[in-house]
């Protein structure tokens, strides 16, 4: 299996497994009383259809009631990350019927989320009670892309203790002992002498180059300025 590179049918099948299969997996594991489902990107949006089917008690040949729709909305939260239209999956209605079956395709049509094609982001937006982008600017862009929805902004962050390299974590432990408990203490890193920062950076760089050598057999020179790009090589990631 592979994440990227398949055709449209392959991609839709992946998203069926993630969304509908994800809900089925949680139920099989005994998680029957979950109160909130958080979807990241539209790839998992079919989870809303699975929850709608649960709410109705079956896959009905009727329009879902407002009560059923609102019950699903109260339980779904959606985060959109992608600021360009190409990042929002759309699947032709005929393909949706082939993969999901006519009954489910008709249900999606009655939910007004399929007009010739199923827009996965639109599906997630329509049936989530709270939606957010991942920065103030991205929130603005998302509201412009999807003007019919209320989209908040929550700035992305990282878990500092996980992302700090071992040499820097050891340095912070020495000079900023509370940084793991409260990341705000990292603001005082500006007072660390530059010579110590450089020494720690070189230690981290050597660890990275040793890891590259272990993985590939290639020995890079630690005296050469080196840039890494830990993302997919796609235009909107702004590798330039």
What are the language-model segments listed below?
Residues 1-240:
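Catalytic cores of carbohydrate-active enzymes across secretory and cytosolic contexts
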């Amino acid at each position: 299996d592979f994440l990227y590179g398949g055709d449209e049918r392959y991609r839709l099948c992946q998203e069926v497994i993630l969304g509908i299969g994800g809900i089925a997996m949680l139920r099989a594991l005994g998680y029957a009383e979950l109160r909130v489902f958080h979807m990241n990107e539209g790839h998992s949006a079919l989870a809303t259809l699975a929850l709608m089917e649960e709410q109705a008690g079956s896959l009905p040949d009727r329009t879902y009631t407002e009560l059923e729709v609102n019950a699903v909305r109260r339980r779904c939260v959606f985060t959109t990350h992608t600021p360009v239209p190409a990042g929002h999956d759309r699947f032709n209605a005929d393909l949706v019927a082939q993969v999901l079956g006519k009954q489910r395709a008709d249900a999606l049509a009655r939910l007004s989320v399929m007009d010739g094609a199923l827009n996965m982001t639109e599906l997630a937006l329509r049936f989530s009670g709270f939606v957010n982008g991942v920065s103030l600017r991205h929130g603005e862009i998302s509201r412009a892309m999807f003007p019919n929805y209320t989209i908040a902004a929550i700035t992305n962050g990282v878990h500092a203790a996980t992302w700090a390299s071992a040499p820097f974590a050891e340095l912070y432990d020495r000079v900023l002992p509370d940084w793991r408990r409260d990341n705000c203490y990292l603001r005082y890193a500006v007072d660390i002498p530059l010579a110590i920062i450089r020494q720690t950076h070189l230690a981290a760089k050597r660890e990275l180059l040793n890891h590259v050598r272990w993985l590939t057999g290639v020995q890079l020179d630690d005296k050469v300025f080196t840039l890494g790009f830990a993302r997919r090589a796609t235009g909107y990631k702004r590798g330039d």
